[in-house]
């Protein structure tokens, strides 16, 4: 309900720590009763003190990692607004969402707003490289949602190596080479065509490497 809240637990503050005397002794007497009563509810829980980072995410159907070059600023540009809506949609389906910005920057209130909505945001100084995070945690995710082909270039190989089971979804935002080609034609500048072909080849390579590609219009869909 309040993802940004902090919970403090003071061990032994109420009844001490001696389980053989006083009110505390009922803890051991009632332990087997408690286990029997809640056995069905706890059946899917992991072992105590193992994988706490995963066990804390109960009541979800899976985990999705979003990767973009930076944290979306929904009041600054259309792409960021779309990114927020896409994250909300995935959350509404029952998935836990983690957001990994390529620059690992904390963007103040924008990062805070994401966290308040229940998104786990990965930033420095807790992580110092995108690759090290993927090496240690990519296997935790059922799917990875990457925005922009140049972000995919920096991440897909690491995801395939450390999370072969994860489906990779590429949202290229728009096809950069098409936009550049239209600009070159409008400016009557054929000298830019070689660079545009290079961008096209890179984009198509990343689209082929992904399991699913999202596009926003029919022209890009036809490509």
Regions inferred by a protein language model and the residue ranges of each:
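A short, active-site helix/loop in glycosyltransferases that binds the activated sugar's phosphate group
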Residues: 153-155, 204-223
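Short N-terminal targeting/anchoring amphipathic segment
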Residues: 135-153, 169
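Active-site proximal beta-strand in glycosyltransferases
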Residues: 162-180
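Catalytic beta-strand/loop signature of glycosyltransferases that borders the donor
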Residues: 1-11
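Membrane-proximal helix-turn-helix segments that form the acceptor-binding/catalytic region
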Residues: 176, 192-212
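C-terminal, non-catalytic tails of nucleotide-sugar-dependent glycosyltransferases
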Residues: 16-63
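N-terminal subdomain of nucleotide-sugar transferases
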Residues: 54-112, 116
């Amino acid at each position: 309900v309040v993802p940004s809240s902090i919970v403090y637990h003071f061990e032994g503050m109420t009844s001490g720590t001696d389980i053989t005397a006083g009110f505390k002794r009922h803890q051991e007497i009632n332990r087997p009763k408690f286990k029997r009563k809640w056995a069905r509810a706890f059946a899917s829980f992991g072992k105590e003190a193992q994988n706490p980072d995963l066990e804390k995410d109960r009541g979800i159907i899976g985990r999705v990692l979003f990767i973009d070059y930076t944290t979306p600023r929904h009041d600054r540009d259309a792409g960021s607004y779309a990114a927020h809506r896409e994250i909300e949609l995935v959350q509404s389906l029952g998935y836990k969402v983690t957001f990994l910005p390529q620059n690992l920057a904390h963007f103040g209130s924008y990062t805070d707003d994401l966290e308040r909505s229940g998104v786990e945001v990965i930033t420095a100084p807790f992580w110092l490289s995108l690759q090290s995070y993927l090496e240690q945690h990519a296997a935790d995710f059922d799917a990875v949602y990457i925005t922009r082909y140049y972000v995919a270039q920096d991440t897909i190989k690491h995801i395939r190596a450390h999370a072969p089971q994860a489906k990779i979804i590429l949202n290229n935002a728009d096809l950069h080479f098409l936009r550049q080609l239209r600009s070159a034609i409008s400016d009557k500048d054929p000298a830019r065509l070689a660079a545009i072909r290079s961008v096209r080849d890179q984009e198509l390579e990343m689209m082929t490497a992904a399991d699913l590609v999202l596009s926003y219009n029919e022209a890009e869909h036809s490509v």
